């Protein structure tokens, strides 16, 4: 492929990408846009690393009851560093999650488990690849 053809193809792909919406399939099969997210950084107190990991594992069950939480990840970044990443169709879904059971449980246990308060950052989803 010549450079000119490559650049034309790249421009077409960029146009399609920017015109497309990101969709996730919900349990009912109806698509939902994923537009906003949260990134929550967590630093475990010394000796509480496995308790934080277990909290995140158990948190998944609580999130299952939140229809507007399209994706939710509890991740370990290092020996004592963890994070939660989740995405929502809109700010109402994000606010519902922040008022939900996982957030309440995290705040209730933060003093015991975390070296510092959770760092909660709101984000806009620019692009993603989701199953479905």
State the predicted function of each range.
Residues 43-53:
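Short, surface-exposed ligand-recognition loops at beta-strand->loop->(often short) alpha-helix junctions
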Residues 75-79:
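A short beta-turn/loop motif at secondary-structure boundaries
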Residues 2-14, 31, 58-71, 87-122:
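An amphipathic, aromatic/His-enriched active-site/gating alpha helix that lines ligand/cofactor pockets
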Residues 41-43, 85-87:
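Short hydrophobic/aromatic beta-strand micro-patches
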């Amino acid at each position: 492929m010549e450079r000119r053809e490559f650049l034309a193809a790249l421009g077409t792909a960029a146009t399609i990408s920017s015109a497309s919406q990101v969709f996730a399939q919900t349990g009912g099969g109806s698509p939902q846009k994923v537009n906003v997210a949260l990134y929550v950084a967590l630093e475990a107190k010394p000796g509480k690393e496995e308790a934080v990991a277990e909290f995140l594992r158990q948190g998944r069950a609580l999130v299952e009851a939140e229809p507007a939480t399209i994706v939710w990840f509890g991740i370990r970044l290092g020996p004592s560093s963890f994070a939660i990443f989740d995405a929502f169709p809109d700010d109402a879904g994000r606010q519902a999650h922040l008022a939900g059971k996982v957030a309440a449980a995290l705040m209730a246990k933060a003093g015991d488990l975390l070296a510092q308060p959770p760092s909660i950052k709101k984000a806009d989803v620019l692009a993603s690849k989701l199953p479905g």
